[in-house]
Regions:
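Compact, glycine-rich, soluble single-domain proteins
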Residues: 30, 36-82
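Intrinsically disordered, low-complexity acidic/polar segments
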Residues: 16, 64, 101-103
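Solvent-exposed residues in well-ordered beta-strands and their adjoining turns
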Residues: 10-12, 58, 84, 95
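Short Gly/charged-rich anion-binding patches and loops
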Residues: 18-19, 36, 69, 119
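Terminal, regulation- and interaction-focused segments at domain boundaries
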Residues: 1-28, 125
Length: 130
């Protein structure tokens, strides 16, 4: 089962991260967290790896509606978006909220998940068209 929406990006890694943040902002998402996985693994384990950033993206309006419908939905928030390098290519991938929220038996959550997924797909597509 696919759980992410991924596109290869024809940009340098740092530019892809910046463009991804901008594209998410256009769709109403703010970045709550930004984790530089490569730097963290180097610091904690002295391990080398490819560039890899996890962005914790939150759309306040959608999150508010989700929390009104299901208090424990915070266990599945925020929506993670990753930008990473693999064998010299750069990729952007967003979680598919419809898949992640499938575990919640609540029709209102399903509808919010569909709306969030549409916005995330638009953001990823926007970066891939740069």
């Amino acid at each position: 089962m696919r759980y992410g929406y991924t596109k290869q990006i024809a940009l340098p890694f740092a530019d892809a991260v910046q463009k991804t943040k901008e594209a998410l902002a256009k769709e109403g998402f703010g970045i709550l967290t930004e984790i530089d996985v490569k730097a963290t693994l180097k610091k904690k384990l002295n391990a080398n790896g490819d560039n890899y950033v996890i962005l914790g993206a939150c759309n306040p309006a959608l999150s508010y509606r989700a929390l009104q419908a299901e208090k424990e939905i915070g266990l599945l928030l925020p929506c993670n978006v990753i930008v990473y390098e693999d064998r010299g290519s750069v990729f952007v991938s967003a979680i598919l909220p419809t898949v992640a929220m499938h575990v919640v038996d609540n029709g209102r959550i399903a509808a919010i998940g569909q709306e969030a997924e549409s916005k995330l797909r638009k953001a990823v597509d926007s970066v891939s068209n740069e």
